Amino acid sequence: MGIKHLFQVIQENAPDAVKSGDIKNHFGRKVAIDASMSIYSFLIAVRSEGQQLMSESGETTSHLMGMFYRTLRMVDNGIKPLYVFDGAPPKLKSGELAKRTARKAEATEAHEEAKETGTAEEIEKFSRRTVRVTREHNAECKKLLKLMGVPYIDAPTEAEAQCAVLARAGKVYAAASEDMDTLCFEAPILLRHLTFSEQRKEPIQEIHLNRVLEGLDMDRSQFIDMCILLGCDYLEPIPKVGPNTALKLIREHGSLEKVVEAIESDPKKKYVIPEDWPYQDARELFHHPDVRAADHPECDFKWEAPDIEALVDFLVKDKGFNEDRVRNGAARLQKNLKTAQQSRLEGFFKPVAKTDAEKASLKRKHDEKLQEQKKRKKEEAKAKKEAKAKPRGAA
């Protein structure tokens, strides 16, 4: 899940922190990728007629299809991916995981009912909600990556936290995940949409943590406190506290301790803090996650030549993939992993920082654009209301 509405908060208050661009812009870069999040997205997105792809024996293959072709796309564009798999979840996350399991059980029941009485759209909707990544999915993806010559490592707990460690140490350029909590783990740069399909035509979003903190006028501790208020994987949010309120409360009070104190002493009782809300524990998990140091032996990785025949055996003979496509993909892997070794020019030039005036100008333009959008929406809503109120047959 990550952090609710965090991207919206960043877009509205720190627009200079987000850069959108083409995948080709990342040529020659090493990137640590949140494997579990990627596999989950493959299981949801890689489908045929609303159903997951299956082998002749009835085994799901969507995760393998996604992992093979999306990794191939990255390597074709000169990126050197390193996948990081989740370990055991922190104890504090068990409550959120239990809720997700319950929601999936409800979705499974609704899916079965939809198959009997529902439309094709309802069947697909509930089918997507039943998706979960299993140990078998992870094991098969690890096997595939090994045969492709693409490295992976196992994190002690949260993959995003381990990706952040590698990015801070300079072993990779960035951490890639759809989970915004990667920024809470102090990833200097977060890439989103990197493992999306080419057909979706979604630009790669590059989010810089230092610019986020600068734009929000917060230090990292305040940023983490705001993210906990927004709602994270470890705690449910405080009812009625939305993104604007969370930002306002941290800016006004400076820390969660003072926010909690202000809420509890408010005679109007505008907000009610949940009975079991151990925010200090959640904060500790963001500040001191269970990770391995970047120079730990288990964080060593290298890219190797693909084992083409073993890939064909696994994907074609075992999983029913098209042999010509697999061989063609393996040949591209072999060629392009070598090409990705070329240095980027940015290694020789220091980027020029924006002046305060340039930053203020960017912020002003963004604010003006937001105001214009709000004004247009207000006018459209007013026009709709007037159209409804107009009596039928009136000229």
From Swiss-Prot:
Q: Which residues bind Mg(2+) 1?
A: D34, D86, E158, E160
What the entry lists under Pfam families is as follows:
XPG_I, XPG_N
Indicate the enzyme's highest-level EC class.
Answer: hydrolase
**Can you say where in the cell this protein is located?**
Nucleus, Nucleolus; Nucleus, Nucleoplasm; Mitochondrion
Keywords on this record?
DNA damage, DNA repair, DNA replication, Endonuclease, Exonuclease, Hydrolase, Magnesium, Metal-binding, Mitochondrion, Nuclease, Nucleus, Phosphoprotein
Region: Interaction with PCNA; residue ranges are 341-349
Q: Which GO terms describe its cellular component?
A: mitochondrion; nucleolus; nucleoplasm
Where does it primarily localize?
A: nucleus
Q: Which residues bind DNA?
A: R47, R70, E158, G231, D233
Q: Basic and acidic residues compositional bias: what residue ranges?
A: 356-389
Q: What does the UniProt cofactor note say?
A: Binds 2 magnesium ions per subunit. They probably participate in the reaction catalyzed by the enzyme. May bind an additional third magnesium ion after substrate binding.
Give this protein's Gene Ontology molecular function annotations. 5'-3' exonuclease activity; 5'-flap endonuclease activity; DNA binding; magnesium ion binding
Q: Please give the residue ranges the record annotates as the region N-domain.
A: 1-104
User: An example of a Gene Ontology BP annotation on this entry?
Assistant: DNA replication, removal of RNA primer
Give the Gene3D superfamilies listed for this entry.
Answer: 5' to 3' exonuclease, C-terminal subdomain, 5'-nuclease
Q: Indicate which residues the UniProt annotation says bind Mg(2+) 2.
A: D179, D181, D233
Chain positions covered by the region annotation I-domain: 122-253
Its Enzyme Commission number?
Answer: 3.1.-.-
Q: Posttranslational modification, per the record?
A: Phosphorylated. Phosphorylation upon DNA damage induces relocalization to the nuclear plasma.
| Cofactor(s) required for function per UniProt | Mg(2+)
State the family named in the UniProt similarity comment for this chain: Belongs to the XPG/RAD2 endonuclease family. FEN1 subfamily.
Q: What does this protein do?
A: Structure-specific nuclease with 5'-flap endonuclease and 5'-3' exonuclease activities involved in DNA replication and repair. During DNA replication, cleaves the 5'-overhanging flap structure that is generated by displacement synthesis when DNA polymerase encounters the 5'-end of a downstream Okazaki fragment. It enters the flap from the 5'-end and then tracks to cleave the flap base, leaving a nick for ligation. Also involved in the long patch base excision repair (LP-BER) pathway, by cleaving within the apurinic/apyrimidinic (AP) site-terminated flap.
Oligomeric form and interacting partners? Interacts with PCNA. Three molecules of fen1 bind to one PCNA trimer with each molecule binding to one PCNA monomer. PCNA stimulates the nuclease activity without altering cleavage specificity.
What is this protein's name? Flap endonuclease 1
The major lineage groups are: Eukaryota, Fungi, Dikarya, Ascomycota, Pezizomycotina
